[in-house]
């Protein structure tokens, strides 16, 4: 099974290199499967060595977006990272299932910028629990832990534990 996954990863990398050229940089070995990469001509993607995933993994880098994922990161099933500005993920990070990282909004008003966005920075050795969403403009410091189900809308200091408590009844 491990050999099969490695062979699949090599073919995936070769296809990406033929399709996107030097705008995609990939470290080896890479143990990724079921990955969808959508990248516009002006966008760049850098993947560090020994990145692993389990199950569906979507990487979207649009416009002039820049996506960088450090070495030795692990992404569980159903990960979606969509980048129109910049997303930087450090080394040795772990991500739970059903993760969404998005560095822009969809502005439904007429403000001139269709997808206003801001850089997302995730430090080294960060652990993000299942069902989390990380929104534009957020900086998560090294060794931080994000509790399951959190929506991260503001900066998280290094070494801290963040949990987004949303138990209020709205109606």
Model-derived features: where do they sit?
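Short, acidic/turn-prone active-site loops that include or flank metal/cofactor-
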Residues: 105-107
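Conserved coupling/switch loop of ABC ATPases
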Residues: 136, 154
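A generic "structured core" feature
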Residues: 143-151
């Amino acid at each position: 099974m491990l050999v099969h996954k490695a062979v699949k990863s090599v073919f995936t990398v070769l296809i990406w290199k033929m399709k996107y050229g030097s705008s995609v940089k990939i470290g080896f070995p890479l143990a990724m499967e079921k990955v969808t990469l959508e990248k516009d001509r002006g966008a760049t993607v850098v993947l560090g060595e020994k990145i692993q995933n389990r199950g569906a993994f979507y990487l979207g880098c649009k416009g002039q977006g820049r996506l960088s994922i450090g070495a030795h990161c692990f992404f569980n099933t159903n990960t979606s990272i969509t980048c129109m500005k910049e997303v930087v993920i450090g080394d040795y990070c772990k991500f739970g299932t059903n993760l969404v990282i998005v560095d822009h909004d969809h502005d439904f008003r007429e403000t001139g910028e269709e997808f206003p966005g801001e850089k997302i920075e995730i430090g080294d050795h960060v652990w993000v629990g299942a069902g989390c969403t990380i929104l534009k403009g957020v900086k998560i410091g090294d060794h931080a832990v994000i509790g399951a189900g959190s929506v991260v809308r503001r900066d998280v200091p290094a070494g801290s534990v963040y949990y987004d408590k949303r138990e209020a009844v709205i109606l």
